[in-house]
């Protein structure tokens, strides 16, 4: 078992040190680099909630540990029982690895944030985090996930934006059935595993800014999906599967800045769809005079075509397109305005290139990893 092996990798002297520290904590809690700054004399403090009793029928205090932005290159020895930590923030440091022995002992961890570090691989013992609900590993150098991540069956949000991922585990969708939000934008993914269509709890899938060449065929199995963003795969993504129109709960679909020439006729069946973004594609069907109209007109055109009819195009109006690269195509299904929070942080039509942020003028002021990896997971 990975968890047991990782635990026994600890040097004996460190185990004795941990036992001594835990005994001290029975009498008084001491501040340390890995302890919460809250005082034991204030049990109502928001950083020290009481937890339900554990198997030993003793109430223990669950801790929120924040070591963000401390320029850490390695982790200090903990001075409290690691099983007491429920939220751990190690973001914005210089960490290159996460010790196997650390994750193996974080038995009650529900949120782990290591974004904006230099981590190249996650430990295999990540699979020991059976209670983990939120994992933010964005802004690192990950090429792949360990297969053991499939054992994090409580996981609800996974943020792996701004890495170097070239693939996801083949079985990731078979095990992470509680996953509600998957953010994997700004990587090097060529395809998504077929098992991803088994994520029946998934509500948000953000796979923009990759190298996706194809999407899985059985997308209709994502019965709760509300937001799908596969934009800005540029010359790689040239077609959408017809099953995309069977996503009956989809509200927002962004396929902008790809190489798509034909929209599937099944999109006409998407009655809950309120926003469709297709700008930056060399679309041929529907024709430009249809795409210049509202979403309802586009839906009716595709429905008529699917039913074998001969859809009539609206009278041609002034084009917003430039050559074959169409700039039209973001349709709102209603008059309601969508604020940035409701868009889940996606890059919408007001997209601007982040290349300019690399200029000397902005050196040290902005980091794309930090800009697109907001620390929102540790609000209580």
From Swiss-Prot:
The keyword Repeat is annotated on this UniProt entry: yes
Q: Per its UniProt record, what InterPro entries does this chain match?
A: Leu-rich_rpt, Leu-rich_rpt_typical-subtyp, LRR_dom_sf, LRR_domain-containing
Q: Where are the LRR repeats?
A: 59-82, 83-105, 107-129, 130-152, 154-176, 177-199, 201-222, 223-247, 248-271, 273-293
Q: Which Pfam families match?
A: LRR_8
Where does motif GVYW map? Answer: 298-301
Q: Where is this region: Disordered?
A: 1-57
**Bias-annotated ranges (Low complexity):** 33-56
In which tissues has expression of this protein been reported? Widely expressed.
In which residue ranges is the amino acid composition biased (Polar residues)? 9-23
UniProt keyword terms in alphabetical order: Leucine-rich repeat, Repeat
Which family is this protein grouped under?
A: Belongs to the SHOC2 family.
Q: What does this protein do?
A: Leucine-rich repeat protein that likely mediates protein interactions, possibly in the context of signal transduction.
- What is this protein identified as? Plant intracellular Ras-group-related LRR protein 6
What is the originating organism of this protein? Arabidopsis thaliana
